[in-house]
């Protein structure tokens, strides 16, 4: 064994061994308990970033630990390879998206191997290959036949920069989630999957997910947005149709003083025929931003349509307005307005001088003051005829029942969730497998024409999709009739909604899934990824699992038992102000900093002498140029050091602050482990450990070893507090470094301790542990070694610490055998100088003894 720890020499050697031995390849084995550990698959952007490294290190630690427990562990990896960035990069680099993507995959695959992740590479998949997306296309045609897929023209969120449609979930604060451009409204024909048909199940089954973070479950609950209310029908004078509205507050119905409809509503369109002001307003609304955050804060505007609706209970005529806060695609495109008890309705009514009628009393029983704002709290009704005096619940039911009796109301459950629009007007995605025949009939692509292959050898102009620009591509024949293929492609969330299941049978050619393999491995035991996916990917992922279950492919209700959302990785961010006042962000690697005595940055400059402004720690990002390249760190310190720092610096679900001093600390620790093993093995062979022959000091050290095993096992397994597990191993290492190594049993005990330390560190730092295990002559490869088990007998304390008090004040702490009697403890306490001093010449009136903990002598 060489004296110095040289990761650059050992890591590549160990990685080659894993490759040649195919160490992490697994197959179904009914005789073993399975464990499926999955990290969210990466987009092949070109290079790994520290967020990836953190995500995949957490996964690898868990997978290696579970493997050492003797389980059959599946840890696969693949590539979420379709998507818009490839199109932009292709235009920029004068290439096509396919070669750019495949080059990136090859490069990033090497980076993953360099970090020592124990993946089953035989299951690697890329979602952009026809071998993968053919099954997604086939499944889509099956869903169409079941009535779960439909096409309709709808107002969509349109990103003018990316030239594509965004799902509601992809609009963040009125902007595109990807490029931050302001989103516009556009009418476009789109394909939808009926996720709303599964709304109740998606909501109710959240209760089964005991090991998912509450934050994620709450976000999904709110997104699904189930509400109970009443659908009410209004007659409209001089209009052929009725208007239907939905309300969750029928108790306020007697205070309804106007109705509001969307600009796109047929009633508004009809009224606009003779109303130029309304026609102009409708045009303006076409470009209104639709994100809910914007809807809440934008100025509320409207125009009176001139139509009057008749209140079904009072018979009063109330005006119908067109308003920019009502959307056609939400509910019925019409809402009832109760300005006395809804703030939005109040603001609108105040602005346009509409009637405000209070019908709910204030909490103290007085009439509410509506001079400044609406009273939105629930309460007792007044001003409501026969319903006066009823509380919220009684009024809800009484008014709902009355409307139902009259045939103008119906109790309804509503959802905020909308069907999933899966059409994208981009090229680099899986073609949607639908065709339109000459006679206008729309039908699924026949099975014998699947997969509909996306041509990869294309020229990108950055504006039009190559398959839309090439009229020949769309031409096909179905049942002898000419037909045109759909030129939209799937939202890339389609591919990432079922990849986890395809990993169980990546080579299967008879269908989407081999049920036998899928049901052996599924559900996923732990799924690791960022919380930013809470309502997009993680909702679609659950939905797809239920679709596959109902197609008979899987037999579980949910795709993953546990979800672990890792925290972000932060780094220092610096900039200097340029000549034109712009911020030039400087990488923390290039910042020369001065710190105060507490280690805080007080001054910084770059190599060119620019005075830098330090903005604190923020998420590693391209925009702030504060990303740290994992490859550079691995080349400098080794993969094991980077992995150890990642797991030690912070709990897995909290933000991690990148500090190179911390990385250096992790590296020093591994050097200490190496040195201790080197010094130990240099002394030659070791005798067998004779537990019965150990001295008290040796027993105490062995107790520490086994207590550490117990703690680390609990920290990694049950608590998943990996940082505290590492801290416990470090603490033990400090004790081992000071332990005597001269006697035969000293060395035998050291051998037992080091074999345990190396196995406990193995999930975190597998390369160094693989090597040290061999040097310590551990049995076989460490990859097949069992996790160390704490010896309960070794952990039993021989002695215990008893606090001795005189009149309630601590006078001594004594060590006594655990089985010492009260008499023996009193005798031992009396030998302490301070205790003897306070007992001299006084009478002990009372003795309070808590066995093994406390002796209190009351004197007087």
UniProtKB/Swiss-Prot annotation:
Coarsely, its chief localization is cytoplasm
Keyword Cytoplasm appears in the UniProt entry: yes
The chemistry this enzyme catalyses reads: tRNA(Leu) + L-leucine + ATP = L-leucyl-tRNA(Leu) + AMP + diphosphate
Q: Where does this chain carry the motif 'HIGH' region?
A: 42-52
Motif 'KMSKS' region mapped to chain? 619-623
EC number(s) given by UniProt = 6.1.1.4
List, alphabetically, the GO terms of the cellular component aspect. cytosol
Biological process, per Gene Ontology: leucyl-tRNA aminoacylation
For this chain, one GO molecular function annotation is:
aminoacyl-tRNA deacylase activity
Q: Which NCBIfam families match?
A: leuS_bact
Q: Give the protein name, as stated in the record.
A: Leucine--tRNA ligase
Organism (species): Escherichia coli O1:K1 / APEC
